[in-house]
Amino acid sequence: MSLPTVAIVGRPNVGKSTIFNRIAGERISIVEDIPGVTRDRIYATGEWLTRKFNIIDTGGIELSDEPFMTEIRAQAEIAMTEADVIIAVVDGETGITDADEAVANILYRTDKPVILIVNKVDNPERRMEIFDFYSLGLGDPYPVSAVHGIGTGDVLDAIVQNLPNEIEEENEDVIKFSLIGRPNVGKSSLINAILGEDRVIASPIAGTTRDAIDTHFVDSEDQEFVMIDTAGMRKSGKIYENTEKYSVMRAMRAIDRSDIVLMVINAEEGIREYDMRIAGFAHEAGKGILIVVNKWDTLEKDNDTMKKFELEIRTKFKFLDYAPIVYVSAKTGQRLNKLPDMIKEIHHAQNLRISSSVLNDVIMDAVAINPTPTDKGKRLKIFYATQVAIKPPTFVVFVNEEELMHFSYLRFLENQIRKAFVFEGTPIHLIARKRK
């Protein structure tokens, strides 16, 4: 289910990033150290009173070539386009500025709820001065000291109160996927080619995200697909459209709404940092991943071309060793007929459930091959394992001491599970828990 979105806006140096980190809490830390992946800090997930939501820091979207006020306005426009709830941040230390008023003037046009935060309210005297901010016309100001964590609970309460009502769970039989990649990798051509392959295409309907267009289609076996697309990629004339961080943010939102991500790479250009960043986000989000190398027809090839390209992919995407690769051409149609079946196979792997008895046989065989590690004379004991979730498949391994389960041994167990069962295209999670 797609999460609602909260966007943070405000001029520089009012403390947007600190507020972002406060709201995100521990969730913004990188749980898994993935070499070569830069985790983008403008997009995170927060949770309060059991409600989860995405947070966007529009201040992370840099428009360095643009005039100062143009950048401020662009941030506000992004918030109005993307968010369910908008947080406007001002500085209680410096008071109201022209830039604050410019943001307020833009936010007057939105029908989205706006929460006004007066940051850097670190003492009672400054708290008395927050009433000046009523003149912005954005409602009751919330006094906050993001550095000290003062007042953030009230802000989180306000966020949750203003989030849209939760919608019912969507049909799990429908496969939702998105095509993600840098500009000019051929996403549009691939979309058109996929939809042109004698599919029964329903009329595009508005998705749960504002201004998003999701395309529903059915294949020859009556499997229903939803192709997630973001209309923002189709808009023109917006000053922030070509900034990389805005593109990253759009991609992250599409990933959030997808079951499976088709990571599209331009064969002519190879893998760039953007690709690694987005792939890392999809991996951490537990999404199914299919690597699609487009424009394969444009390369001059010899017997080793595909082998060399796969080596580059596996070297740079070490954390995606489970993701299948397909080399296609949207222009000629080469191998495009494979995509729907590959997507369905990944969807099947994501939803695969393994009985505890069969799983534990695999675990015990693995331990026989490679005995559990020891630390200071104490050996790790594995009592049993069980599957607790799907999408992605998640297993809990009950042990005598969690600290004895080294990451490398957990990875070994994962590899043995993958050898025993078909989990191609999906991450699987193994969690060590002390048996009580």
Swiss-Prot record:
Residues of the KH-like domain: 352-436
GO biological process: ribosome biogenesis
Cited PROSITE patterns: G_ENGA
UniProt-listed CDD domains: EngA1 (cd01894), EngA2 (cd01895)
Molecular function per GO: GTP binding; ribosome binding
Binding site for GTP 2: 181-188, 229-233, 294-297
Residue numbers binding GTP 1: 10-17, 57-61, 119-122
Keyword GTP-binding in record: yes
InterPro entries per UniProt: G_ENGA (IPR031166), GTP-bd (IPR006073), GTPase_Der (IPR016484), KH_dom-like (IPR032859), KH_dom-like_a/b (IPR015946), P-loop_NTPase (IPR027417), Small_GTP-bd (IPR005225)
Family: Belongs to the TRAFAC class TrmE-Era-EngA-EngB-Septin-like GTPase superfamily. EngA (Der) GTPase family.
Subunit description: Associates with the 50S ribosomal subunit.
Protein name listed in UniProt: GTPase Der
Gene coding for it: der
